[in-house]
Amino acid sequence: KKELVVGTNPSFAPFEFTDKKDGKVMGFDIDLINALAKKAGYEKVTIKSIAFDGLIPSLESGNIDVSITGMSITDARKQKVNFTDPYYESGLMAVVKKDNEAIKGLDDLKGKTIAVQLGTTGAKYAETIEGAKVKTFDSSDLACLELKNGGADAVISDLPVLQYFLKQGGSQYAKSVGTPKKGDFYGIATAKKNKDLCDKLNKALAELKKDGEYQKIYDKWFKAE
């Protein structure tokens, strides 16, 4: 039997998150990897939930075959794993409280308290902001809760994640500010030694984009109501 073991950190809606009703991991990434696996000839997909910073070590040790988790392709990560072609273009965005008029964009965050999710591109970016106090959380939801409770001036995270948060009710107390910083691409990670798998997934991804299946999955999660 051909089984694909997939590692993900399900705290990044709408890419991967745990369904409150039945505890199943769901999301755009999950639908995509299932479709890719099927195209590539796998009979079974097993999803393992792993802490974000444990994903690359799990690939290296062979505990999982691939990781799909809204992971940005960066040079530092490329030294440890192989990435597929990008499957999603993201970018960074900030959200603040609805009544905050002082922060108009990412440039106004100097010296402010910023909530971020551990290990993300947003967390890295926050560290570069002059005089900012960065508070780190295990999930993007918890970072947003800190904003709601008044413990942070802003949350920096990936554009689609924060858009989804606003759409799911966050807009009652929060708003996005400024222009998103684009040019961040998500890829599926495989172990360095597993080059064949990477090639297989790239081929499957190209096919999904060509036959309209990718667009269907995309629309399911990202099409505005």
PLM features: residue spans?
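A ligand-binding cleft/hinge motif common to bilobed small-molecule-binding domains
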Residues: 54, 71-79, 125-128, 148, ...
